[in-house]
Design a protein with these regions (language model features):
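GST-like fold's C-terminal all-alpha helical module
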Residues: 1-72, 77
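Terminal-tail/helix-coil boundary detector
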Residues: 74-90
Length: 90
């Protein structure tokens, strides 16, 4: 329903803003080092095109996303089921 879509769009936009604010203060979500917080959150952000919010509107979140997207293990995991998949860029 339109109500449900709008509700969850607002929630997702709020989460983007909170993540962006956090990443303004630190390189990664839990501080200066790459941790399970980043590992668990990145796959959700990798679907940013589905969220229809515009990751490029969040400078710090975009930086974090792109930095993690370049990690060899992340690329390998992203392509695990389909070698032709390309990690979406903002």
């Amino acid at each position: 329903s339109e109500f449900g879509e709008e509700r969850y769009f607002k929630i997702a936009r709020r989460i983007y803003g909170e993540l962006d604010a956090r990443l303004k203060e630190s390189k990664f979500l839990a501080g200066p080092d790459y941790t399970i917080a980043d590992i668990a959150t990145w796959p959700w952000m990798a679907r940013h095109e589905w969220h229809d919010i515009g990751l490029k509107n969040y400078k710090n979140l975009s930086r974090w996303y792109l930095e993690i997207a370049e990690r060899e293990a992340v690329i390998k995991g992203f392509n695990f089921m389909d070698k032709d998949l390309i990690i979406p860029k903002p």
